[in-house]
Amino acid sequence: NVKILEKIYDFTKEKIDFKFHTCIKSVEVKDSNSFVVKTDSGEEYSCGNLVLATGRSGSKWIGSVCDKLGIAQKSNRVDIGVRVELAAEIFKHITDDVYESKIVYKTDKYNDMVRTFCMNPYGEVVAENTNGIVTVNGHSYSQESLRTENTNFALLVSNKFTEPFKDSNEYGESIAR
């Protein structure tokens, strides 16, 4: 919700320096209590606390920063699935009461948990391009004039990896390719 994000930003903007759309060249430990961040445009920033928010598309880069700084990493789960679109009327009895409903099914054979995610009543399926890999996502609109006659949601199965194969992002990308 944009209003919530605006409130978070307004609350923190006097306490935190935000740098958006900034390409970082390196992150170094200055001493035990501070960092130096260098950008590709030659700027340098020093700080005691550092939050790097790269998102999934920057996971390889942030992994290399962690390796360089000796920060332990943990393999995350990866969600593999499809986006389902159907007539909104089919789920209306659910989405009119619970906008973002979660439906979970446990398979008999492997005990996998299959779940819905990101339900979009009266929404649309859209293409997304992340690092040259095209995937799909869904949107819905509060403005009635933009609504469609369809509802869409992701149907996902989660996988968690351990040694020796632990790169869940690479696995997800290989499936998407």
Over which residues does each language-model region extend?
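Residues forming the flavin
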Residues: 1-177
